[in-house]
């Protein structure tokens, strides 16, 4: 759509101006400023079709990685995610060298990207533990950033018609949906005060619907249901009264949108099953250390058999599943570390007595990994680490 191409180019510039004004007016310190810039970059630059914007995002990640190294060196106390990322990096390097990754441009690029994201994830997680008002500033920034952007997403959807999935500043609708879903929960980690504060999350939910990402809606809808049922019963009743006639009125159109999406995804579903078969074949061939981090996209074709049909006609494909990716590329060693970190953070949910927002952030990260690849996203690691981060904040009364 030409309209979205226009927005992909102009919106990052407009949002940059708003971000600079926000940082200047709040007089934020360097740590919080970096976090705000990271979220700006993720929303506006990371998956934009423009290579200039993507390179700019990589520069932001690189700059923050250097700053994070300073935080890691100066910080005497070692946190859980420091140990995890170190051992996970060991598993990545082992698979890289065992499989001669230096001969693969894909493996080299993936290794560099992972190291930068690993350092960035340690840095942002450390800031979330150390900075008392980080959640307040981030929540406020996301509300201001996404209030008008959500309206634009909805308008693009209405203009384009049912069945159209909005990408906005991203190159993939699911990436946009993941950011919107995470933002909904981050915003609710701070009490909402005025009417606009309460309207923004509703706009975010509507904007998520416009992406057509059911995996995010399956988490977002229960989140709002339990949130307003617990904290604001009157608003829950009002929203229910409004929603019922809307759902009845648009049932036919919503069904049409779903059917269009299902037809488009039929081949994708079959491909995902065949990807599972490929991962199974890889695991049987290289169970301990896998085929090497970042190698699936180019190595999968060597593990096709007679039961696999669709993938024979494809030159490059990813696993669309973090668990498949870790098992195929890093083997049992990497898979053990990955699952350990997830289960360890699930344990910390018990320690913080199931904090509502943290619980849904964690569920969103873990469930999203079943359908997408997120290992090179600082947002995924931040969300997966939130139970531990929140436990540390409570422990030190931050």
Regions found by a protein language model. Give the residues of each.
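N-terminal signal-anchor transmembrane segment
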Residues: 1-71, 92-100
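Alpha-helical transmembrane segments of multi-pass inner-membrane proteins
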Residues: 119-127, 134-162, 169-230
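Hydrophobic transmembrane alpha-helices and their immediate junctions
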Residues: 194-195, 233-235, 329-365, 390-397
């Amino acid at each position: 759509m030409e309209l979205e191409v226009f927005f992909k180019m102009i919106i990052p510039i407009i949002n940059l101006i708003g971000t600079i004004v926000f940082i200047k007016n709040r007089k934020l310190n360097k740590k919080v400023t970096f976090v705000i810039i990271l979220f700006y970059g993720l929303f506006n630059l990371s998956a934009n079709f423009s290579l200039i914007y993507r390179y700019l995002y990589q520069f932001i990640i690189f700059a923050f990685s250097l700053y994070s190294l300073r935080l890691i060196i100066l910080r005497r106390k070692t946190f859980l995610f420091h140990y995890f990322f170190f051992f996970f990096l060991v598993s990545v390097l082992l698979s890289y060298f065992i499989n001669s990754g230096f001969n693969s441009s894909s493996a080299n690029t993936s290794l560099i990207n992972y190291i930068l994201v690993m350092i960035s994830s340690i840095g942002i997680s450390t800031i979330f533990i150390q900075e008392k008002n980080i959640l307040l500033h981030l929540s406020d920034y996301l509300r201001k950033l996404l209030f008008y952007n959500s309206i634009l997403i909805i308008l693009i959807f209405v203009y384009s018609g049912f069945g159209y999935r909005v990408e906005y500043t991203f190159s993939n609708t699911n990436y946009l949906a993941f950011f919107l879903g995470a933002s909904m929960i981050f915003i609710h980690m701070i009490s909402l005060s005025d009417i606009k504060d309460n309207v923004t999350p509703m706009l975010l939910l509507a904007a998520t619907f416009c992406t057509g990402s059911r995996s995010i809606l399956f988490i977002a809808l229960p989140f709002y249901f339990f949130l307003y049922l617990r904290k604001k019963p009157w608003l829950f009743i009002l929203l229910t009264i409004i929603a019922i006639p809307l759902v009845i009125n648009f049932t036919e159109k919503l069904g049409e949108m779903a059917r269009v999406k299902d037809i488009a995804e039929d081949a994708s579903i079959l491909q995902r099953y065949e990807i599972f078969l490929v991962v199974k074949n890889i695991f049987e061939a290289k169970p301990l250390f896998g085929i090497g981090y970042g190698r699936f996209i180019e190595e999968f074709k060597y593990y096709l058999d007679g039961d696999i049909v669709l993938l024979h006609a494809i030159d490059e494909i990813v696993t669309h599943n973090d668990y498949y990716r870790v098992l195929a590329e890093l083997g049992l060693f990497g898979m053990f570390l990955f699952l350990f970190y997830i289960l360890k953070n699930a344990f910390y949910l018990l320690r913080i007595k199931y904090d509502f927002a943290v619980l849904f952030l964690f569920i969103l990260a873990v469930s999203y990994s079943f359908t997408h690849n997120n290992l090179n996203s600082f947002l995924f690691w931040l969300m997966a680490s939130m139970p531990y981060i929140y436990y540390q904040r409570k422990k030190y009364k931050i």
